[in-house]
Amino acid sequence: MPTFDLPGFGHVADRFWRDGIVNGAETITQHDDCRSSFDPTARVIKLYLNYCFIDIEGFRAGKRPMLIKEIAWFNLSTLRGDNIIFRFNSEHAKDLTPSDWKQMKYFTKFIHGMPFFYGTQDYSCLSIIIRVIQSQCQCLITKGAEKAVILGKLFNLPIIDLGEAEGTPSYFKLATKFPIPDNFWCDFHKKQKTALPHCAMTKINLLLSYVLSRNISKP
């Protein structure tokens, strides 16, 4: 599946190159274990071109695996990303109990706002997206222990959880520091006016802005 430039990443990508964070091959060092080469608690964080910021939102019901509803990612090697909300069909709903549906409605109303059957791409596209991201990236960067576990089951890649870094602000605090323009939101959440706390595109924009600000700021 082709990816394309996200408007929400434009000014961040421009600043990424303008401030010389990546300036030729001398700034890129390959490591066998990217986890050991990335210190999220350091004042100056080295950014390598094979990292990918990623976030997911979805539905949970009982002990069922999470049904991923939305995925957003930004690949530092290409400065390109995408945001997709998946469309479930009757097959995904046929085994859901009344109790399951109650939980699904709770997620829609109080968590991410996305109705169960709404979507922009068929859920079958998820496997293609996983293969594309996996082929292009060496490490995934996200925030949240539970999310890191879920991503670890989907991808055969190291996962860096910025939530483990001491002093990493909450998304609400990040949104205060980095005001959210409309193009930071996916189209769905922009219309709903509910970017936080559960728009995947907004969250990776905020994480990327936060990491870049720590690199640009004085050591």
Which residues are covered by each model-predicted region?
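N-terminal accessory regions of nucleic-acid-interacting proteins
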Residues: 1-10, 14-56, 60, 83-106, ...
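Conserved non-catalytic scaffold segment of RNase H-like nuclease domains
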Residues: 64-143
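Metal-dependent phosphoesterase core characteristic of DEDDh/y 3'-5' exonuclease domains
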Residues: 81, 92-98, 131-219
